Each structure stands twice: as C-alpha cells, then as structure tokens.
UniProtKB/Swiss-Prot annotation:
Topological relation to the membrane, as annotated: Lipid-anchor
Gene Ontology CC entries for this record: actin cytoskeleton; early endosome; endosome membrane; Golgi apparatus; late endosome; phagocytic vesicle; phagocytic vesicle membrane; plasma membrane
Subunit details: Binds EEA1. Interacts (in its GTP-bound form) with RINL. Interacts directly with ZFYVE20. Interacts (in its GTP-bound form) with RABGEF1.
Keyword field: Cell membrane, Cell projection, Cytoplasmic vesicle, Endocytosis, Endosome, GTP-binding, Lipoprotein, Membrane, Nucleotide-binding, Prenylation, Protein transport, Transport
Record gene name: Rab22a
Organism: Mus musculus (Mouse)
Keyword Membrane: yes
Protein name, entry field: Ras-related protein Rab-22A
Matching Pfam families: Ras
Molecular-function GO terms, alphabetical: GDP binding; GTP binding; GTPase activity
Tissue specificity annotation: Detected in brain and heart, and at lower levels in lung and spleen.
Function: Plays a role in endocytosis and intracellular protein transport. Mediates trafficking of TF from early endosomes to recycling endosomes. Required for NGF-mediated endocytosis of NTRK1, and subsequent neurite outgrowth. Binds GTP and GDP and has low GTPase activity. Alternates between a GTP-bound active form and a GDP-bound inactive form.
Amino acid sequence: MALRELKVCLLGDTGVGKSSIVWRFVEDSFDPNINPTIGASFMTKTVQYQNELHKFLIWDTAGQERFRALAPMYYRGSAAAIIVYDITKEETFSTLKNWVRELRQHGPPSIVVAIAGNKCDLTDVREVMERDAKDYADSIHAIFVETSAKNAININELFIEISRRIPSTDANPASGGKGFKLRRQPSEPKRSCC
C-alpha cells in the first residue's frame, strides 16, 4: 500500500481550539486546560484512505498576533490548511476571512482549504450561524464542517474529507509518468601552463 505524506497546517485565532482538534484527531483525547501554542507544534497520524496510507504531518500554529508572521513558513508546501473559528465568537469568524486571504496570496495554489467551526457543542451561546459559515466556505470552494474537539464531533470526518479532496497520485502523475535522467557533464581535459 502506497504511503503519502500530507502536510496540513491549522490556522486561526488564539483560543478557537486548533490544538484541541489536533489532540482529538491524533490522541483521541481532550484536555480542557491545554496551554496555548507558542510558535507551532507538530504531530503526525497515519490513516488508511482507499488504497493509500495518508500520513498527516500536522502543524498546529499559534493564533496570537505576535506569531502571525510565522504562519507562511508553516503553510508553505502544505497539501491542506484547516482554518478554525469558534462558533461562540463572531470576531473569530471575521478574522478567518483574513487568514483565507493571506493563504490565497502566499500559500500553494493547489492547497485544499477546510473551514472548521469549532465548539459546536456550545450551541446555546452560538454567535456564528452555521448557514453563514457554510455559504462563505462554498463561495471560496472550501470544505466546511462544524466540529467539537471536546465531544469528538466531526474531527475524523474533517480529515477524511481532506483526504478525499487531495488529488490522488494516480490521477495526476508527475511528468506524465516519465522521469528524466541526470547525466554527468563530460569533463574537459585539464590545462596547465607548464
């Protein structure tokens, strides 16, 4: 079975639950007292998707303003980006649009974008309507899902949908399946003055 490494970065404001989503996906656990990410953290998880193994190389970025300049370093070369907002905080959804704009300007052109409305278990204090977020995601051709890292809602489904959207290696083989050979340049005879 073929193994594909897929770099995925999580972007979004501080406190939206990026680290909790990663922990739920990788470790199937939830820590309500998780510390804010400083810079970025890295975790991996391998899952089977159809006839391939997908090894997700997950970069969980810090959401604080002082770390925003580092974000391009993490999404450069990514197969996918998950932009997370908190359904109970309207401002995190507004800021999400800035993350999308930055990603479109500086990220890989073929990056798969997913929007995750986290904390969907807190519907009684919801500020972002699911329909509004879904409409926005559709307008930018992004995956949309509401998640709850706390209650393990739609976390695995999010990564399955990312696997589904990433073009298969069979569908688009590099160079039409043809490679090229490197050849050594013939060396010229050395000249000497004596």
